[in-house]
Swiss-Prot record:
Gene3D superfamilies noted in UniProt: Ribosomal protein S10 domain (3.30.70.600)
PANTHER family, A to Z: 30S RIBOSOMAL PROTEIN S10 FAMILY MEMBER (PTHR11700)
Gene: rpsJ
Keyword Ribonucleoprotein carried by entry: yes
Record lineage: Bacteria, Bacillati, Cyanobacteriota, Cyanophyceae, Synechococcales
Role of this protein: Involved in the binding of tRNA to the ribosomes.
Pfam short name (any one): Ribosomal_S10
Quaternary structure (record): Part of the 30S ribosomal subunit.
Organism: Synechococcus sp. (strain CC9605)
Protein family (similarity comment): Belongs to the universal ribosomal protein uS10 family.
Keywords assigned: Ribonucleoprotein, Ribosomal protein
One of the GO biological process terms: translation
Protein name: Small ribosomal subunit protein uS10
């Protein structure tokens, strides 16, 4: 049997359409973790998802005339090792932009 102690970890997944807003949110989270003596690893970039929508330009006849729109979803992961109660409280009070989706796993 292994005698290694399981280390506690928080995994934060971030998603956003705007890459700059996502990077600013990652910087805030890492800065908060560093200020509370926790170890932050990341941000680890995940593949960007592209969703393309094809729409007819004309409401009536011209099927050959189409327009394409796309949305890009940028994603990042941040791992925080050995978090304290102070770290968790600071992360809960953190004010992040509304365009960033955050998922936290303990």
């Amino acid at each position: 049997m292994s005698t290694a102690i399981a280390q506690q970890k928080i995994r934060i997944r971030l998603k956003a359409f705007d890459r700059r807003m996502l990077d600013l949110s990652c910087e805030k989270i890492i800065e908060t973790a560093d200020n509370t003596a926790a170890t932050a690893i990341g941000p680890i970039p995940l593949p960007t998802k592209r969703k393309i929508y094809c729409v007819l330009r004309s409401p009536h006849v011209d099927k050959d005339s189409r327009e394409h729109f796309e949305t890009r979803t940028h994603r990042r992961i941040i791992d925080i090792y050995s978090p304290s109660a102070k770290t968790i409280d600071a992360l809960m009070k953190l004010d992040l932009p509304s365009g960033v989706d955050i998922e936290v796993k303990l």
